[in-house]
Design a protein with these regions (language model features):
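Cyclophilin-like peptidyl-prolyl cis-trans isomerases
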Residues: 1-257
């Protein structure tokens, strides 16, 4: 009887030790767990693959927006419509004209077919973002309405939608003024190959002084962009009503629409 009791006591002790070990490991795992940043894979027709690590800790709105658009197929078939050597390559315009972007319906099924924008996540707009604009940095493109009025600074800062650009060279002038949200981790050679395609002056500006020569003659096409989130749901971005520059202009000059 004594022997049986001893065996039962030993089994109970082992069970307690195992339980403590399991619970302890669980707490250790939780304490040391670090989530893996999402990684976007972009396929560019006739060029190759570009992989970009995204940083939700720096620009959560931009990252959530990008993930939804990419994984819903919005970027498939878009083009690198603006290419400036020793500066950046830009894509994400719905019609490839640099003027059009995504709609709310591109973010989710059942969304309205309306334009939208997101908050600019950078220091000048009151958001801490420490990503520097160096070779390979990925950032949201936005409008600059301050050329029309200095009062439109905030409207400019919060005008990003779907267009983004990849830096091909460091440019510190952009630090704190544009929402950087990622970095190329593979395929920087592909980025430079795109950067080096033949370009021409923007349509309508051919004979204009200081016209930007940035429109590719043979436009590089994005086949697809998909983002691996490693099981983490980054949710929906908080969308804003975009600034209607045309209506503002009419109002400024008292012109009826």
């Amino acid at each position: 009887m004594k022997k049986v009791g001893k065996i039962i006591w030993m089994v109970a002790l082992i069970a307690i030790i195992v339980l403590i070990g399991v619970v302890g490991f669980g707490y250790y795992k939780k304490a040391t767990f670090t989530s893996q940043n999402p990684v976007a894979t972009m396929e560019v027709e006739n060029f190759g693959t570009i992989k970009m690590e995204l940083y939700p800790d720096q620009a959560p709105e931009a990252v959530a927006n990008f993930i939804k658009l990419a994984n819903n197929g919005f970027y498939d078939g878009t083009t690198f419509h603006r290419i400036v050597k020793d500066f950046m390559i830009q894509t994400g315009s719905k019609d490839g004209d640099g003027k059009t972007g995504a709609k709310l319906s591109n973010l989710k099924d059942g969304g309205e077919n309306k334009d939208y924008s997101i908050k600019g996540e950078f220091l000048a707009n009151g958001v801490t973002n420490t990503i520097k604009f160096e070779e390979g940095t990925v950032a949201m493109a936005r409008a600059d309405y301050t050329q029309y009025s200095s009062n439109l600074k905030e409207k400019s800062y919060n005008s990003a939608c779907s267009q983004f650009f990849i830096m091909t060279k460091e440019n510190t002038n952009l630090n704190g003024y544009y929402a950087a949200f990622g970095k190329v981790i593979e395929g920087m050679d592909i980025v430079h190959n795109i950067e080096n395609v033949e370009v021409k002056a923007t349509e309508g500006q051919e004979n204009t002084e200081n016209a930007e020569v940035s429109t590719p003659v043979n436009v590089p096409k994005v086949t697809s962009i998909r983002v691996e989130t490693f099981g983490i749901d980054y949710g929906m971005p908080n969308t804003l009503t975009p600034f209607d520059y045309t209506s503002w202009l009419y109002k400024q000059y008292g012109i009826g629409q």
